[in-house]
């Protein structure tokens, strides 16, 4: 759970987006209506540090979702403090982080929304590099839908930012998915995410 009240979260969202709109005055959002009530996994491409801000900010969620973030951010002074205040779930990407997985599952089962970037870190060329299976695993284990999303990859100054939110779906995987199911589901997820951005760059 994040430490900010709903009121504070909404104030900070408006403040940060206002600042970002100075360098990107035009933001085009589509598919916001696809986000279901209750628990779901918002899963997007990741090409810049600002992606969580564009995605969470323009999804216009009533409360702050929890975001899965790489553990390396805990070593960055200001960002580390802010991420902790927002209730981010830090993940060790070098192996199976059972603590992070259990925390994420608990979050979803309590009806909260979760943001997961399958690529695990910024990918600048638009081609996923060994995406992680976490989003599909969590969806399979909790039976929560995945909501694919795409955020403009090449964020040039004063150019439009597109945030495209796709329809929710349940990956084809059993409650205790095999490695093959997880790999296939993750491949399909990345195809869906990048498919949302076709023709937008």
Which residues does each PLM region occupy?
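Short, basic, glycine/proline-bearing loop/turn elements
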Residues: 16, 85-90, 118-121
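Flexible, charged surface loops at secondary-structure boundaries
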Residues: 34-37, 109
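A transmembrane-helix-recognition feature enriched in membrane-embedded lipid enzymes
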Residues: 1-30, 77-86
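A generic structural signal for well-ordered alpha-helical segments
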Residues: 20, 60, 82-83, 107, ...
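Glycine-rich, highly charged phosphate/nucleotide-binding loops
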Residues: 26-28, 96-100
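Catalytic core of membrane glycerolipid acyltransferases/transacylases, capturing the structured
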Residues: 36-95
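Non-catalytic C-terminal accessory region of glycerolipid acyltransferases
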Residues: 3-8, 100-201
């Amino acid at each position: 759970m994040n430490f900010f009240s709903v009121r504070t979260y909404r104030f900070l969202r408006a403040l940060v987006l206002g600042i970002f709109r100075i360098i990107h005055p035009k933001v085009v959002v589509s598919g916001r209506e696809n986000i279901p009530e209750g628990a779901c996994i918002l899963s997007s491409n990741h090409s810049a540090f600002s992606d969580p801000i564009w995605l969470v900010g323009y999804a216009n969620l009533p409360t702050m979702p929890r975001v899965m973030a790489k553990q390396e951010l805990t070593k960055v002074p200001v960002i580390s403090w802010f991420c902790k205040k927002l209730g981010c779930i830090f993940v060790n990407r070098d192996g199976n982080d059972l603590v992070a997985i259990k925390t994420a599952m608990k979050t979803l089962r309590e009806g909260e929304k979760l943001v997961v970037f399958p690529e695990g870190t910024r990918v600048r060329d638009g081609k996923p590099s060994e995406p992680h299976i976490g989003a599909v695993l969590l969806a399979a284990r909790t039976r929560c839908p995945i909501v694919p999303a795409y955020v403009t990859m090449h964020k040039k100054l004063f150019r439009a930012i597109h945030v495209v939110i796709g329809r929710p779906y349940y990956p084809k995987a059993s409650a205790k998915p095999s490695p093959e199911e997880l790999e296939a589901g993750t491949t399909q997820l990345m195809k869906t995410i990048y498919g949302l951005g076709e023709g937008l760059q």
